[in-house]
């Protein structure tokens, strides 16, 4: 039951580098009162200053009612983690 659910979304920087690993924490614009039920993330773009590089993937890693972080996954080659979009549902 999602009566009075809170839906949030945004765009954040994934660090603008090719480093794989866990990111720092990102704050939700508004804290969820009791729980964040689900968090979805996807890469938005590559850096136009580095056109030979490509994005790999960001995965939701940990989240609380006030913040979250992601894991930047490199599948090989020459990655570049630019910005990513996120969507969260909670109460």
Give the positions of each predicted feature.
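Extracellular attachment/recognition segments
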Residues: 3-91
